[in-house]
């Protein structure tokens, strides 16, 4: 089949590679426009755009995928289907109606759980033992379409959102190809989502990524892992903001937010137990071990994170 892949971040690259290796023909790639990034605010292409250029594929980068210029280009490409992986913008009805088999979205949750932009992050922060991914038929509602295929993936006790996304992206790419094969063969069967079990996964805000030291050690661990690598869990010390890396819950009793520096570890108190702090990254600087940070900063007895 003729395909136009819609995707933007690194997590969508495995799907593009899998489609290029399949018997289907990727005739173009739809991705978000180049965006300013870094200290110099230079225009940077998305990971999918870079991979598409390497493969010599035509790129579509509209500000919104509903303009007449984009719709005309899509109609001219005449795709049979448009697979989607983390594209980053809503697709309007006019575009949904162009391919004869519609748009097939690889979503990183077991729908109807965690509909929205941050399903993996929300699953980790919620303490889910299992998550997964599914391929569903895109429609105008938010992740509401019928599901063609799905698979489960356990959430390990130290898994970050980034760890899970990497695994789901690779396995999901293969499932996406299988669904497209079934559609082409006429054997595909999509099942409507159940009305029960719906949960929403809006994008994680910067404020949500702030560590609440009045939470339990387990809750803080989940929040840090769910916000890794993006947007990054953070806290403040002496009025300065910085990111904190992996933490390990331990039973040691330390007052909430209090910093306890030991010879080989740095503890931070919580509402229940404490956490061993792994890394610290001050604004504009590289990440460093918590012990190195403590040696340089020298927290005084009784000082706290806030």
From Swiss-Prot:
(6S)-5,6,7,8-tetrahydrofolate binds at residues 109-112. GO terms for molecular function: methionyl-tRNA formyltransferase activity. Keywords: Protein biosynthesis, Transferase. It comes from the Bacteria. The keyword Mitochondrion does not apply. Residues 287-306 are annotated as: Disordered. InterPro entries: Fmt (IPR005794), Formyl_trans_C (IPR005793), Formyl_transf_N (IPR002376), Formyl_transf_N_sf (IPR036477), Formyl_transferase-like_C_sf (IPR011034), Met-tRNA-FMT_C (IPR044135), Met-tRNA-FMT_N (IPR041711). Its EC number is 2.1.2.9. CDD domains: FMT_core_Met-tRNA-FMT_N, Met_tRNA_FMT_C. Disulfide bonds: none annotated. PANTHER family: METHIONYL-TRNA FORMYLTRANSFERASE (PTHR11138), METHIONYL-TRNA FORMYLTRANSFERASE, MITOCHONDRIAL (PTHR11138:SF5). Attaches a formyl group to the free amino group of methionyl-tRNA(fMet). The formyl group appears to play a dual role in the initiator identity of N-formylmethionyl-tRNA by promoting its recognition by IF2 and preventing the misappropriation of this tRNA by the elongation apparatus. This is Methionyl-tRNA formyltransferase. It comes from Kineococcus radiotolerans (strain ATCC BAA-149 / DSM 14245 / SRS30216).
């Amino acid at each position: 089949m003729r395909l136009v892949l819609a995707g933007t971040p690194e997590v969508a690259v495995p799907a593009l590679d899998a489609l290029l290796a399949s018997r289907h023909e990727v005739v173009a790639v739809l991705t978000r426009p180049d965006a300013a990034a870094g200290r110099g605010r230079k225009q940077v292409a998305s990971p999918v755009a870079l991979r598409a250029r390497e493969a010599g594929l035509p790129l579509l980068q509209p500000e919104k995928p509903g303009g007449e210029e984009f719709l005309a280009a899509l109609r001219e490409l005449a795709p049979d289907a448009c697979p989607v992986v983390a594209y980053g913008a809503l697709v309007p009805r006019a575009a949904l109606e162009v391919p004869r088999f519609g748009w097939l979205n690889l979503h990183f949750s077991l729908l109807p759980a965690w509909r929205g932009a941050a399903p993996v992050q929300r699953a980790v922060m919620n303490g889910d033992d299992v998550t997964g991914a599914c391929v569903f038929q895109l429609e105008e509602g938010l992740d509401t379409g019928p599901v063609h295929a799905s698979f489960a993936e356990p959430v390990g006790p130290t898994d970050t959102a980034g760890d899970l996304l990497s695994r789901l992206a690779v396995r999901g790419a293969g499932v996406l190809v299988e669904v497209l094969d079934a559609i082409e063969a006429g054997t595909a069967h999509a099942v409507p989502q159940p009305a029960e079990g719906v949960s929403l996964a809006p994008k994680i805000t910067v404020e949500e990524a702030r560590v609440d030291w009045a939470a339990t050690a387990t809750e803080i661990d989940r929040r840090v892992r769910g916000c890794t690598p993006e947007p990054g869990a953070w806290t403040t010390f002496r009025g300065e903001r910085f990111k904190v890396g992996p933490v390990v819950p331990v039973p040691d009793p330390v007052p909430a937010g209090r910093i306890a520096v030991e010879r080989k570890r740095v503890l931070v108190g919580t509402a229940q137990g404490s956490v061993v702090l792994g890394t610290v990254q001050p604004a504009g600087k590289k990440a460093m071990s918590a012990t190195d940070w403590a040696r340089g900063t020298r927290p005084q007895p009784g000082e706290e994170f806030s």
